[in-house]
Amino acid sequence: MERLDKAALNALQPSDFRNESSLASTLKTLLFFTALMITVPIGLYFTTKSYVFEGAFGMSNRDSYFYAAIVAVVAVHVVLALFVYVAWNEGSRQWREGKQD
């Protein structure tokens, strides 16, 4: 009976600690890109509105809102594309490492 209990306990425990490091790495990546998703579009919106469109190009306030919003939307898409690229490469790397064992 003890042998069955030990086998059941071993089945419940993870066989290696790569899952924990993988989870931590994934969480760090997610938090990093979350911070980028918040700061980059907002920062680019106000920077391009004030300094580029109104300052350098001399656009009106109404036009600069429009073009700065377009820059912010493009920035969101760039951050999302980078996140997908990093997540794809990280997942395939972990899959290859697990496959070699």
UniProtKB/Swiss-Prot annotation:
Assigned keywords, A-Z: Cytoplasmic vesicle, Endoplasmic reticulum, Membrane, Transmembrane, Transmembrane helix
Keyword set includes Ribosomal protein: no
Location relative to the cell: Endoplasmic reticulum membrane; Endoplasmic reticulum-Golgi intermediate compartment membrane; Cytoplasmic vesicle, COPII-coated vesicle membrane
One Gene Ontology term, aspect cellular component: endoplasmic reticulum-Golgi intermediate compartment membrane
GO biological process: vacuolar proton-transporting V-type ATPase complex assembly
A Pfam family of this chain: VMA21
Record family assignment: Belongs to the VMA21 family.
Protein name (Swiss-Prot/TrEMBL): Vacuolar ATPase assembly integral membrane protein VMA21
